[in-house]
Amino acid sequence: MKAVLALATLIGSTLASSCSSTALSCSNSANSDTCCSPEYGLVVLNMQWAPGYGPDNAFTLHGLWPDKCSGAYAPSGGCDSNRASSSIASVIKSKDSSLYNSMLTYWPSNQGNNNVFWSHEWSKHGTCVSTYDPDCYDNYEEGEDIVDYFQKAMDLRSQYNVYKAFSSNGITPGGTYTATEMQSAIESYFGAKAKIDCSSGTLSDVALYFYVRGRDTYVITDALSTGSCSGDVEYPTK
């Protein structure tokens, strides 16, 4: 692929902008060019419910994780050590202060250090989103891939509002509900099943699964498992 990209550069082609917008990742018709369809074509949006972190009426982000189509994980050490970074917070703040400020609200670390958290998410997961490889851009600017990755995760969190999915079905913080009720609320609101995880019977995470149409259009699909929640689940207030 890199040889093709090099040739495209020499002849002035705009390869990234010419990608097909119809092929769905993990399908037989998926584009073999990893700039046009992600190499790891099943992507997980994981959101947290952590009392004391983020707005009282919002799930916060844990990460956007590209996986193999089978559900197997991408490499645990990330996919491109040359693009790993330990200073993601400063990169985002300098490139897009609005995104940075939104991440402070909706992507806080529950361990107290946002930069360490974000740098981990980028280095382990962001570098595995092949469509954000610098070679895939027509006129790449340093840090553009980083901003695009985090902006996409933030956009998906906003578009797939789990708090609203629950509240629209009568599930609100401070109550106890069955795991089945929570699953049904997500499925009726988004049209797909979620992975819902608990810690000692208390809601902790909700994960939504996506395929990718073309380079950057995310299409929700059923999660590969229902998660660890079972029976009665506490949904605490923040």
Swiss-Prot record:
Molecular-function annotations in GO: ribonuclease T2 activity; RNA binding
Q: One GO CC term of this entry?
A: extracellular region
Q: Which residues cross the membrane?
A: none
Catalytic residues, per the record, are: H62, E121, H125
Q: Which Gene3D superfamilies does the entry mention?
A: Ribonuclease T2-like
SUPFAM superfamilies in alphabetical order: Ribonuclease Rh-like
- State whether keyword tRNA-binding applies: no
Under the heading InterPro entries, the entry gives: Ribonuclease_T2_eukaryotic, RNase_T2-like, RNase_T2-like_sf, RNase_T2_His_AS_1, RNase_T2_His_AS_2
Q: Which GO terms describe its biological process?
A: RNA catabolic process
Q: Report the superkingdom from the record.
A: Eukaryota
Q: What is its EC number?
A: 4.6.1.19
In the record, which residues are listed under signal peptide? 1-16
Q: Give the reactions, separated by semicolons, that this protein catalyses.
A: a ribonucleotidyl-ribonucleotide-RNA + H2O = a 3'-end 3'-phospho-ribonucleotide-RNA + a 5'-end dephospho-ribonucleoside-RNA + H(+)
> Which keywords fit this entry according to its UniProt record?
Disulfide bond, Endonuclease, Hydrolase, Lyase, Nuclease, Signal
| Disulfide linkage | C19-C36, C26-C69, C35-C136, C79-C128, C198-C229
Establish whether keyword DNA-binding is in the entry: no
* PANTHER family, per database record: RIBONUCLEASE T2 (PTHR11240:SF22)
Main role? Answer: This is a base non-specific ribonuclease.
Q: Which family does it belong to?
A: Belongs to the RNase T2 family.
Name this polypeptide is given: Ribonuclease Rh
The organism named in the record is Rhizopus niveus
